[in-house]
Structure formats: C-alpha cells, structure tokens
A protein has these predicted regions:
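Peptidyl-prolyl cis-trans isomerase
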Residues: 1-183
C-alpha cells in the first residue's frame, strides 16, 4: 500500500498526457458520454413553465436562474456541462425506458422532459460522444493513472529483485544447487 501511495504521487500530468497521446487507440468508450444539465422537481413546484424554457439554454444568466430555482424547489440538480458523464449514469436519474435500449436517443433528442406521478424531469444534452469513440482525456485520466502506477510497480519490484540479487552476489551469499543428472 505504501508503494502504491508513493507511486501514485509520482505520476505527473505530463506522463498522463504523453501516455494518452501515445496510446489513444486503447481508450474506447464502452458507453456513450454526455455533457449537459439535469433537474428533477416536484410536479407541484411553482414556475415550471420557466424551467421548461431555462433548461434548454446554456448561458450564464439562465444557469444562475436554474441554480437559484433548484435550491428552493429541486429534488435533484446536476450541472455537468463541464464534465463527461456516462449515459447509464444519466439514465439512472430519469424514468425513460428508451435509454435502456437506445443509448443514442440523447444524441437525437437533446432536450428531454418526462413526468411521472410525483416529479417532472428535465434533461438538456449539450454534447454527445457515441460508444466506441475515443475516450476524452478527462474521462480516461484515472484509468491511465492506474496503468502508469502498475507499470511503475512492476519496474520497482524488478529493480528491488535485481538489487537484492546483486547485493547477495557481491557478498557471496548465493548458493547454487545442481541437480545430479545421474539419478
């Protein structure tokens, strides 16, 4: 564990970027990714008409209005314009069965409004990356860091083995056993 912590701290952003650039073809999406905004409000909330207009727009004034509104009224609010989120993670928040079977639904329908008996769900998709496309660096960063840690761990273990062997050899502490081939 101590080795892992030391190695994790030794991984630089430059190493991550270099590994990503050199091995882009290894990083493919298993699920589509989206950037956008999600808000879930009770059906009894005031000003739902405004929310219907606001959630479709991506500008600072409207986002501020939505954030203030969500503090007072929303059960759930997620602003993810600045980070990629997997479609299954988004689908878990909204009762829309088509997302279970058609992952590209959100590429074709960038504004989604769904109601159930208690809530109204609003989802705006600003950006969409399809399955099997290259993972964005931000989304692949943790995976790359783990790969680099594992590579350094193997390198460290091999160096320790080599050092131990060399020290034992220098001190004549190595005993060789030969099998008798006559038996």
């Amino acid at each position: 564990e101590l080795v892992n912590q030391k190695l994790a701290n030794d991984i630089s952003e430059e190493e991550i970027n270099a590994y990503y650039e050199k091995n882009k073809e290894l990083f493919r999406l298993d699920n589509p990714l989206v950037k956008g905004l999600f808000i879930k409000v009770p059906l009894s909330s005031p000003d739902l008409g405004n929310v219907r207009v606001w959630y479709r727009k991506n500008n600072q004034d409207v986002i501020e209005k939505l954030e203030k509104y969500s503090l007072r009224n929303a059960v759930s609010y997620d602003y993810f314009y600045d980070r990629w989120t997997s479609v299954p993670d988004v689908a878990a928040k909204i009762p829309l069965k088509v997302l279970d079977t058609d992952a590209n639904y959100l590429d074709k329908n960038r504004n989604v409004e769904v109601k159930d008996t208690a809530f109204c769900y609003f989802l705006h998709i600003e950006d969409f990356l399809d399955k099997d496309k290259q993972k964005p660096l931000d989304f692949a960063r943790d995976e790359i860091k783990e790969i680099l840690i594992n590579l350094k761990r193997v390198e460290f273990i091999n160096k320790v083995k080599e050092d131990l062997y060399q020290r034992a050899s220098d001190r004549n502490k190595i005993i060789y056993y030969y099998l008798n081939s006559d038996e």
